[in-house]
Every structure is written in C-alpha cells, then in structure tokens.
C-alpha cells in the first residue's frame, strides 16, 4: 500500500474524459521506408505516352520522356517499350532503332521480347525487310541482346507488317522459313489464313482470299469471325454483294447452330457491309442492314460505324437520311463523348448541301464544326470548310455573301488552289461579277514588253549594295530596317546567297550563317515575262541576274551583274481599270 501511494503522488492527475471519447495515447515513430515505397510510379507517364501515340504527337512524347529522365534518372522497360511503339506508329523507325540500341547497350535498362516484336513490326512497315531478317537471325542464334527466345509472337508481328504492306512474296518466305513455330499440330492455324486473306485483299487480289477458304475447309479448320469479316470485305472489293451477304448469313447460321456468340456479326461486319452498299448505291439494302445493326443487342455502334452510314447515305443521294443519322450521332454524343463526329464527317455533309445550294444548312454545319467535332482540325480542313461555305452561297444565288466569303478567304489563306471545288467556285463568281466587283482584277505590264530580256530593266548589282558574308549582323543591322532582302557576296565578289529580314535572328552571327543559299539566278537573256512568272510562282523577293556565259544555275560560281526585285515588279504593274 505504501508503494502504491508513493507512485500515485508522483503522477499528475489527468482530467477525466467521457468514456465514449477516450482514446489511448500512443507514441508515433517514423516508419522506415521500404524499397517498394521508394519505387517511382511511372504508370501515369505510360498512359500519357499511349494517349499521345494515338494523336501522333511524337515530338511531345520525346520531350516528356527526356524531362522524365532528368527528373527520375532512369525509366523502366515498360515505358520505353511504349515509346518504341509510338515511334513505330508514327513511322519514325530510325528514332525507334536509336532508342532500342540505347536500351540494349551495357548500362541500359535492357530489352525484352516486346521490344524486339515492336522493332520487327516497325522494320516491316518501313519495308526494311533485310534488317528485320538479320535481327531474327541474331535471336535465332542466341546472339541478340537480352537473349530473347524466338517465338511465334515475334514472327507474327513482322508477318502482319509485311501483309499490311501487300508484300506477300516476303510474307510467304517468312512462313516457309519459320513454319515450325507457326504450325498448330502440323497444320497452319486459322490466324495464318486470316493474315494471308488480309494480305490478298490489300494487294488487290480479293478472289485469291476467297479461294483460301476452300483450303481451310480441306484442312478441317473452322473459320472464325475475323475470317468471315475478311471474306465479306474481299467480296465487296470484287463487287459481289450477293456473295458477301451469303457469307454474312452463313456466319449467323453457324453462330446459332453452335451457340457461339464469338461467331455473331460484330460492328466491323456491319460497317463493311454498309460501305459496300454505299459504293453500290443500294439505298434499300443499306437501310435494312443499318436497321438490323441497330436492333442487334450485342453490337455497339461506334463512331466509325455511324460515319460509314452517313457517307453511304450521301453516296446513295439520300441527304435526308444522312441528316437523320447525323442528328442521331449528335444526340448520342451528348451522353458519350466518344461518339462525337470527326471533322471530315462535317465536311462530307457540307459538300452534299453545298452542291444543293442549301446555304443555311452549310452555314450551321460550318459554325458547329469547331465546338462540336472531335480531334484536331487541320489547315486543309479549315480551307475546305471556307471554300464550301462560299460555294454554298454561290449556288444559292447570294453573290454578295459569296463575295464577302471570298474576300475573307483571300485575306486569311492568301491563295486559292484552282483545281479544287473552291477554286472553281471562285472562277464562277468572278465570271458572274465581272470587272466591276472583281477582287482578282488582272494587272498588266504595259510599261514593258514581256519578250524583252531582263537585262533591259534590271538593277545593276552594285546598286543593290551587297554585303560581305563574314560581317556580323550587329554591324549592319540598320540595313535590314530599310530593305527586306540583301545580296551576300564572298571575298571574290561572287553572290553566294540572299539574306532576308525575317532570318536575322542572331546579332553576333556572321551573315553567311543566316543567308539562304544558293540564290535564284537567271541569265541576262531571260525574258521579262519568264522572270515575272518566276517571282510570282515561287514568291521570290529578289532574283540575281548573271551573264549568259557564266550561268550555272546555282549562283555559287556565277558573277552577278544585276538583280530584279519584287518591288520593281509592283512598280511595273498597272491595274486594268486604268486601261479601260
């Protein structure tokens, strides 16, 4: 009792807490970090690379990978394999090979069978078959880095690339050499026949793909869904829609007979048939197959299928049907952004309504192209959209509206290709407006005779005040505030290039490092008309004139005697209104 009371006097009494909120106090010690906790999570980087690969933004991938190397010091094989796949997908096999060698060299992160399969596929796509076979030989002989095993997956990657390129000769050679790895119980597998069928279709020999079916049946190989899809595609390429529908019906009958859902037609099957009926302009069959696709519970109609239906409707001349399907796409895309249409679908709709002269519909599609479409809108798509808007206004009889659109096109794009539908619409508009409202008024060279030699109107070369190429830009910078382009000469006085104002970006650099070389040269006997055409076609700011005997076409060894500038050309122009 005395001992207990002594201890109790040393302990400071604590305030009582309610029993429901009592929490025992416990001292916390920092936990020692385990090796697993120190691991770097690179999954977000891999997902980012996969996303950029789909967008074909290889430059952005390289930048982010280099930044990750500086941050983490070392990446793993999974990340670098995704980078290799990005290089192959974007068609840059040289960059893929360089990264592969960095991975395989001593001190690198190493390579595996996936790395080799990706490189083999890339070499096949680039048609560098000899290098691919050399790599396969090193794997076969066991001298390859990482000591991968020769497997069917490596062969299939190269085989698929060869078949996609239509190189069936080398594909058959690959099968003959490595048939032991690819044979299934002594006979070719269904996968091999599917690949060969696809190769024959890609090489414009669809009938040969259909003939392979008989060989499969003789070997007692049962066709799968991919086989039937390839056969249907081959029949459509041959223009035999009846045979395509026969395979389609056989496919459904076998699926019901064997209770095999993997034999049921999928969205690829229906999309292939839709394209076939669209090419054949068979609207009734197209509507039937589209209705069947919508009623099929196991088929999810994706953006590709919807786009194919709209294009097929337009080919059949049913703009109302195409508009209904297009509206359904927009309605479904509100709940599922994956279904948002691509820009080229908007262009297809705009082309159809522009021909009909439905300016209101084309304008609505034009305004919704930017906010409602999915993916990037390229410069070519923007130009065509502007041209279609002008064409629709012209076909609708709204000449003033079409003229305003044409003015905006000229201000924005500076040029109109005459071979396009927009160029033809501009020509029609110019014809209807005449000289009174034309924005493309001709300018005549009334002050000179185009057949005369350029020597008669050129500026003497000394008058252009050329600069020595060894001078630094900071010593002559004020010269480019007054002139857009200046000739550059060497120590012997020969013109070696032209320095433009927009290329002057380093004050401490010599002029020769920034000039454009060689300069465009013409002889003194070249006609004025030919030089004018050259300046306008290539948008040149200056042309160097050399003696006929010294002309070599490059300007490096030619003694310049004169120059002709764009400013001179503008002074020679005279508007047609002054001549009327």
From Swiss-Prot:
Keywords: CBS domain, Repeat. GO terms for molecular function: mRNA binding. SUPFAM superfamilies: CBS-domain pair (SSF54631). InterPro entries: At5g10690-like, CBS_dom, CBS_dom_sf, Pentatricopeptide_rpt, TPR-like_helical_dom_sf. The keyword Thylakoid does not apply. Residues 486-553 form the CBS domain. It comes from the Eukaryota. PPR repeats lie at residues 76-110, 112-142, 151-181, 189-223, 224-254, 266-296, 302-337, 342-376, 382-417. Belongs to the PPR family. P subfamily. NCBIfam families: PPR (TIGR00756). This is Pentatricopeptide repeat-containing protein At5g10690. It comes from Arabidopsis thaliana (Mouse-ear cress). The lineage of its organism: Eukaryota, Viridiplantae, Streptophyta, Embryophyta, Tracheophyta.
């Amino acid at each position: 009792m005395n001992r207990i009371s002594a201890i109790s006097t040393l302990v400071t009494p604590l305030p009582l807490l309610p029993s429901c909120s009592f929490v025992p106090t416990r001292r916390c010690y920092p936990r020692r970090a385990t090796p697993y906790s120190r691991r770097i999570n690179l999954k977000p980087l891999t997902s980012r690379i996969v996303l950029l690969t789909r967008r074909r933004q290889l430059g952005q991938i390289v930048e982010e990978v280099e930044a990750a190397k500086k941050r983490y010091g070392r990446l793993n094989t999974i990340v670098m394999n995704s980078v290799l796949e990005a290089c192959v997908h974007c068609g840059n096999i040289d960059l893929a090979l360089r990264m592969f060698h960095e991975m395989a060299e001593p001190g690198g992160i190493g390579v595996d069978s996936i790395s080799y399969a990706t490189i083999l596929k890339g070499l096949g796509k680039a048609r560098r078959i000899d290098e691919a076979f050399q790599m396969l030989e090193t794997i076969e002989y066991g001298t390859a880095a990482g000591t991968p095993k020769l497997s069917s997956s490596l062969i299939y990657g190269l085989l698929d690339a060869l078949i996609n390129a239509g190189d069936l000769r080398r594909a058959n050679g690959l099968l003959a050499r490595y048939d032991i790895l690819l044979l299934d119980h002594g006979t070719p597998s269904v996968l091999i026949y599917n690949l060969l069928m696809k190769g024959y279709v890609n090489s414009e020999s669809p009938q040969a793909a259909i003939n392979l079916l008989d060989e499969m049946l003789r070997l007692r190989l049962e066709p799968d869904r991919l086989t039937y899809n390839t056969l249907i595609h081959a029949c459509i390429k041959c223009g035999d829609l009846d045979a395509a529908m026969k395979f389609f019906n056989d496919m459904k009958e076998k699926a019901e007979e064997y209770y095999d859902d993997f034999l049921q037609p999928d969205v690829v099957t229906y999309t292939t048939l839709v394209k076939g009926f669209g090419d054949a302009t068979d609207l009734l069959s197209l509507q039937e197959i589209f209705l069947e696709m919508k009623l099929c519970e196991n088929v999810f109609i994706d953006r590709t299928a919807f786009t194919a239906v709209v294009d097929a409707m337009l080919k059949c001349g049913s703009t109302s049907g195409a508009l209904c399907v297009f509206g359904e796409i927009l309605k479904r895309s509100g709940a599922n952004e994956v279904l948002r249409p691509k820009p080229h679908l908007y262009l297809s709709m705009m082309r159809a309504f522009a021909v009909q002269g439905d300016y209101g519909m084309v304008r609505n599609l034009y305004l919704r192209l930017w906010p409602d479409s999915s993916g990037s809108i390229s410069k070519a798509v923007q130009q065509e959209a502007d041209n279609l808007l002008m064409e629709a206004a012209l076909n609708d009889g709204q000449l003033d509206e079409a003229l305003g659109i044409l003015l905006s096109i000229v201000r924005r794009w500076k040029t109109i290709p005459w071979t396009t539908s927009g160029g033809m619409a501009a020509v029609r508009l110019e014809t209807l407006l005449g000289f009174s409202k034309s924005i493309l008024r001709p300018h005549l060279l009334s002050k000179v005779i185009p057949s005369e030699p350029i020597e008669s109107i050129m500026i003497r070369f000394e008058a252009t005040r050329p600069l020595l190429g060894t001078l630094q830009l900071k010593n002559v910078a004020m010269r480019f505030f007054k002139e857009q382009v200046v000739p550059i000469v060497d120590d012997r006085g020969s013109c070696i290039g032209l320095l433009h104002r927009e290329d002057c970006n380093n004050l401490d650099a010599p002029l020769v490092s920034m000039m454009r070389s060689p300069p465009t040269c013409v002889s003194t006997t070249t006609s004025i008309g030919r030089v004018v055409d050259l300046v306008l076609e290539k948008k040149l700011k200056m042309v160097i004139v050399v003696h006929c005997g010294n002309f070599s076409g490059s300007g490096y060894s030619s003694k310049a005697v004169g120059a002709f500038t764009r400013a001179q050309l503008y002074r020679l122009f005279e508007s047609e209104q002054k001549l009327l």
